[in-house]
């Protein structure tokens, strides 16, 4: 028996998303209050300078909220995101802030707690869920806990409670898979797998867990919507079982305060390992990211669209075995990776955006990705800073690149926010349209996949996505050629005849025959 779907075509052209159309496309936001969002990762120190000192801060971020989400979903001039991930904001000794000195503070470079509260309150008013980076695998070596612990060791005061806050051992107790550093000439060593200035906390210590509970409560009580968990697989190095147990404990504590908090972990590993972590937390999908990931490979024509769709379906099946409510978290790049515009050229940046922004779950956009910012590691040390360059606003914002930057700014050839807002076919306008389509069609983020097998096609593929008895079809053409395809050869679903659209890249549906222009994705409803 054939299912008859009421199908209307919402097309996302990769060259001209702002073109006039003969009929109105329904892009009215369908707001559902749940955990599904479009997130935007921000390195506060490089985003926007609100006081003129060259450093990004919360005053600057507050001033840029209209760019991200102006609070009026019908106005349509903002990016349209409804989630923000803030990289570490607590007092630290480094530019990147992953070495926390005080867990209940705002780093002085970013302003005051009052500045943060003002930003957070306004973001919440606009329906933006703000999650913050939580770095609890390790602290700074300048944290008062560690200072107390090392002073106690040097004074042979081994019963001091802070000694047991950290993983501190004698020579004969050192494990070969871990990195250690001696405390003076004491014969005692602390674990520091990331850096000698980042000593590892001892999560077997009940006092440490009590401290973590207080940290969780402090930020959730302020109105933070959840956490991004840094180094989630390193709490117990090379021990997935104990890590999952720890994060289950953590989530129990989170839910005591905020049942709907969104928590996503950094587990940079294969899907077989990530599957286990989904028993406790949501995780980022690293297999989709970077130059060799599924998104870039599909956009650049290294693998077929059909293979990409098969991967999405298989990955979702894997994580949903661990947790029926598991949420996919796709992304192209983040602060630890070379920026995508370095390996995705021209239209391929838009193709890649379509692939992950039209997938299920919560996509994460790395700040500047929507304007094609570039940045990659250099030859010298400390060049992760090149991946965290100052946002290119194109106005009087004085925010500067972080310390350690060696990137040649002349390589930034894709323009600024200001220039792209003026250009109707810009990458920024493309992202704006994509997010509108996501917000108007809840089936995209929340739907259950039914893959359609296009195994005889390479540059064309797609699937059905069903949510609350409403089904949409999502199809991609990643090639430079127009493709005409009879959908009835691949699926028993029937689609309504489609009105034509005006634009440089037009998509047409004639009966069951779909004609889709180059570098175009369509949503059928």
Task: Name the predicted role of every residue range.
Residues 2-10:
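Sec-dependent signal peptide recognition
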Residues 482-503:
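Beta-strand-rich binding/interaction modules
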Residues 20-213, 221, 228, 232-277:
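Acidic/aromatic-lined carbohydrate-recognition and catalytic surfaces
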Residues 82-83, 127-129, 225-227, 260-262, ...:
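Beta-sheet entry/capping signal
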Residues 508-525:
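C-terminal beta-strand-rich structural cap/linker in extracellular carbohydrate-active enzymes
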Residues 34, 331, 343-484:
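Loop/helix patches that line or flank the sugar-binding groove of alpha-linked glycan CAZymes
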Residues 120-122, 127-128, 137-138, 143-155, ...:
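Active-site-proximal helices and loops of the catalytic beta/alpha 8
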């Amino acid at each position: 028996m054939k299912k008859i779907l009421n199908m209307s075509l919402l097309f996302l052209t990769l060259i001209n998303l702002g073109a006039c159309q003969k009929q109105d496309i329904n892009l009215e936001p369908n707001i559902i209050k749940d955990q599904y969002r479009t997130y935007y990762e921000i390195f506060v120190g490089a985003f926007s300078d609100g006081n003129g000192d060259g450093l990004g801060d919360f005053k600057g971020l507050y001033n840029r909220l209209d760019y991200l989400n102006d609070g009026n979903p019908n106005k349509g001039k903002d990016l349209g995101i409804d989630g923000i991930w803030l990289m570490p904001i607590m007092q630290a000794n480094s530019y990147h802030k992953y070495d926390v000195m005080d867990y209940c503070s705002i780093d002085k470079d970013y302003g005051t707690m009052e500045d943060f509260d003002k930003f957070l309150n306004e973001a919440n008013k606009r329906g933006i869920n703000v999650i913050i980076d939580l770095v609890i695998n390790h602290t700074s070596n300048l944290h008062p806990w560690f200072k107390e612990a090392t002073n106690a060791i040097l004074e042979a005061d081994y019963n001091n409670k802070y000694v047991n806050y950290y993983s501190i051992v004698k020579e004969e107790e050192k494990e070969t898979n871990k990195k250690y550093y001696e405390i003076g000439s004491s014969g005692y060593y602390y674990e520091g797998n990331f850096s000698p200035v980042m000593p590892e906390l001892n999560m077997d210590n009940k006092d440490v867990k009590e401290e973590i509970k207080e940290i969780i409560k402090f930020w959730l009580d302020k109105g933070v919507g959840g956490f991004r968990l840094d180094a989630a697989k390193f709490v117990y190095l090379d021990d997935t079982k104990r890590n999952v147990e720890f994060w289950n404990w953590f989530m129990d504590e989170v839910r005591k305060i905020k049942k709907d908090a969104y928590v996503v972990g950094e587990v940079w590993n294969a899907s077989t390992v990530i599957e286990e972590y989904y028993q406790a937390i949501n995780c980022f999908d690293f297999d989709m990211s970077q130059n060799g990931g599924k998104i870039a490979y599909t956009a650049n024509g290294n693998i077929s669209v059909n293979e990409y769709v098969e991967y999405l379906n298989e990955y979702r099946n894997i994580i949903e075995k661990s947790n029926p409510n598991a949420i996919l978290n796709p992304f192209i790049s983040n602060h630890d990776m070379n920026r995508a515009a370095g390996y995705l050229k021209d239209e391929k940046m838009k193709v890649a955006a379509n692939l992950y922004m039209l997938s299920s779950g919560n996509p994460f956009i790395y700040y500047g990705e929507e304007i094609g910012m570039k940045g990659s590691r250099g030859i010298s040390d400390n060049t992760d800073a090149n991946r965290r360059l100052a946002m290119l606003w194109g106005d009087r914002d004085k925010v500067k690149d972080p310390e350690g930057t060696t990137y040649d700014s002349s390589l930034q050839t894709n323009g600024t926010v200001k220039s792209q807002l003026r250009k109707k076919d810009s990458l920024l306008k493309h992202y704006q349209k994509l997010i509108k389509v996501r917000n108007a069609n809840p089936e995209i983020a929340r739907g259950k996949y039914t893959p359609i097998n296009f195994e005889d096609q390479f540059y064309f593929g797609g699937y059905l996505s069903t949510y609350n008895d409403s089904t949409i079809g999502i199809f991609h053409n990643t090639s430079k050629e127009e493709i005409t395809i009879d959908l009835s050869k691949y699926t028993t679903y029937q689609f309504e005849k489609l009105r034509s659209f005006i634009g440089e890249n037009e998509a047409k549906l004639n009966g069951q025959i779909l004609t889709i222009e180059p570098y175009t994705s369509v949503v059928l409803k």
